[in-house]
């Protein structure tokens, strides 16, 4: 046993220090980025935000809607091959370039992903997702996926430390998914005591990944557009959003009505709700590590997407970054004890 004395920070612990700027308007900010990935060699350009691979967020409808904003969607792994085929038949090439195919690490998951990727060559992204990216089996699966799909861009996670980030990149991942426990419907930190404050995880993993020519996606912990800006400021190449995109018309959650008001269910992918739906219940040897919440219906996701992108542009103007790429170089974080004046938040 040992204790690390270094202070670790989450998004709520900091603000971005403003700096002189020559930008006249938020409209001057370029949010699109262009990446060439280490292993796949593929080049992609767009806004580096990803809708999370949760079945109440990462839906085909969400992919259609967010492609119009140049945003990616990691489509959840629970669609059948037939459902994928039907979606591909109606989706444009532009939509497909904004889609990630999500998979687990079982043999059945692998075979299903092989079939999905064979449906259309425009599917260039694979998202290999497990709750605990520290297992040797996971590393071996990433290597197997890289061998099977040498020209596909592979995103793999989740981890929170530099050495494991490096391990996954060296095993074939182009993008490493960073985050254990920060999600709005994740209870891993409560159930297990395991986790890492998200901003510090992003900073440390970005440093490790960029040294090897890899990239990271900050997954979880964003509750408002300012958190997205902080994640990019901390060095994230991509930011993945779950709760911020839940509860919309395109989100795919079940709608319930209480006292004349409609709500949409949103749950973590390790929650009892998710396991009841997909694997017949919580196994006897494990505990649920997610919760289910009811969100007021929020209308079309386009309104929220515009709000997020607008906040991100504004953050860039406050530090003089004319492009999103420049944000991390221009970011100075200050530690704080308050984020906002909350006097009217309950009204």
Curated annotation (Swiss-Prot):
InterPro entries: Aldolase_TIM, GMP_reductase, GMPR, IMP_DH/GMP_Rdtase_CS, IMP_DH_GMPRt. It comes from the Bacteria. Coiled coil: none annotated. Pfam families: IMPDH (PF00478). SMART domains: IMPDH. NADP(+) binds at residues 108-131, 216-239. NCBIfam families: GMP_reduct_1, PRK05096.1. This is GMP reductase.
